[in-house]
Amino acid sequence: MRFFFLAFLFVLLFLSEKVQGQAVSWGDQGNGTYINPILNADYSDPDVIRVGDKYYMVCSDFHYIGMPVLESDDMVNWRIISQVYNRFDFPGWDNNENYGGGSWAPAIRFHDGKFWIYFCTPREGLMMSTATDPHGPWTPLHCVKNIGGGEDPCPFWDEDGQAYMGRSQLGAGPIYLHRMTPDGKTL
């Protein structure tokens, strides 16, 4: 029995060395193909738009270092080009009291010559920032509505120019549809 156990441990050790020695290949393969994940990082709740021949992406940022904006020519190779904000100025954000809070499920849009980013925070509400260039600078965060527990904002502008905001509530709550002012600052 002891021999079997030692042999088993030896095989496990040998196999773990084999697995550790193999390179993990992900992203662009250089031959017109790719292997997921294309981004080897935590980019949850992505939202992507195409403007001209470029793609722009934003994702949830559960920490407080600022939401990155990424750019791509092919939706495989991404680079960080700016940050929407540098830090939150809300109480408790600077001492990790709200770890996991941050900005949730952002939406990026291009409308009327401007980039618009909306996201919710767990307690402070629905936030918005704009820029004429995705590389920045981004306007200071504006609280569109203080709705704690809001999630998944989805702004859109109708053909007649009327702006709307669709959103959910924490825990897959009901879906809300709000009229929004044309400047995107008020529901």
Labelled PLM ranges:
Residues 1-22:
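Bacterial Sec-dependent N-terminal signal peptides
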